[in-house]
Amino acid sequence: ETVHVKNTGRCKELLIPGCNVYLEKSENPNRKTLYDLIAVEKRYDEIFDWGIFPLAFRKRMNDGKEKTLLFNIDSQAPNKVVLEWLKKQDYSVIKPEFTFGKSRFDFYLEKIDSVTGKTEKILMEVKGCTLEIEGVGYFPDAPTERGVKHLNELSDAIGEGYKSVLAFVIQMEGVTEVFPNVKTHPEFATALEKAKASGVEVWFLQCGVTEDTLEIVDVNNH
């Protein structure tokens, strides 16, 4: 059976022969493929030194007693779960797909400062992280010129009075932060450092993952 993989990345460390995957049946009977691949189990059978892993990841894997970890690889899921999460926060305005400059960002937000009463304008770009190496998340897993462009324009927006946020949705449990994948796309790593230096905030959105759900459970701001 041929299925559609709902991810534009490579996922080569996940989609290996013999791995367990989870499918979702399409509601479109006219599609070439009947199913979408939305999640995959990664095995950790041959880890000999769990001491190299971050504490949070070791705790999630019970110091190696757990042998598999579920990854959500649906590239459409991050924006959906972020929207649901944003609705539970104290934003007065939430606009998906907002155009600024030559880019379209995932969200435009407004929040009223409880002290000053002023309205804070926020641009947010969402990126899903599905690459984990030794308990740490990395992005991207394939070159993304669009991602570089977004970072540059997030930096520009700060000069025009916006707060700019890059939000990584971590699509596996136990991982608490995401680093730039220098080996795969050094330009993205450079752009990210410049963006952070200009004032762009980086948020790590930690998730609970099941076979058919993805839910934000914690947030780290950097």
Label every model-predicted segment.
Residues 8-22, 155:
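Short nucleic-acid-contacting surface segments enriched for D/E, G, S/T with interspersed K/R
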Residues 172-222:
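Domain-level recognition of nuclease-like catalytic cores that cleave nucleotide substrates
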